[in-house]
Amino acid sequence: MHRSCMEVSCIIDKIPLVNENYLQYNDIRKREKFSFANRKDAMCMSRSSFEALLGFHGAPTFAGEKPAVLLSFKKSQFEDFDAMLASFTPCFRCKGISVLRLVEGEEYVLVLFYRARRIARFVKRADARALLRSCGYDDDAPLSVLLAELQRRMEIKKTFPHEIGIFLGYPPEDVRSFIEHRGKDFALSGYWKVYGNPDAARALFARYTACSEEFCKKLDDGARFEDLVVAS
């Protein structure tokens, strides 16, 4: 059952809308091929622009470097968002990527793209299990049940449970410290807030950024999105 735009907006506002962020990126890069996005009379986003948007925000996950990414979409910028997303199902399924619409309103939707096998293994790590257990999850449950519980909490609380970092593959140490320090006193801020081993995290973040740049360049050069998505 869809929640109202007002109900879901308090969650959506916690993370950037990929469409709007992409417009900023579009202005910086001056990509004329995506100039439709800056026109007030633009009606819908093309498939190629959607692929570029996915690449810009989710390349590390689609290229196999990162196990998951959470993106928000403004559905009115698509002629048919459901159909657009569904058209990628064969590619994602073949490459081992699952898609879960975590929270949805009339206007916005939060979509989790994740490599189920990797996340399923990750949540069974001793430190990840301990954190989930401390947050009230059944750490013996399979990934599907854990995600259903995460989804339920997001709908009820209308905010991001801190443990969502575990489902995005963030180090449990960083997730736990984020909770304990209430998001403050971190050693490094990048793709997430780092509390332990900032040097390793800095190198990882640099790899993610390089991956995104390479992915987007290949798309610009004419590569097919499906060919750039790595199987796992």
Residue ranges and their predicted role:
Residues 41-105:
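A structured, charge-rich N-terminal accessory region that forms the first stable segment of a protein
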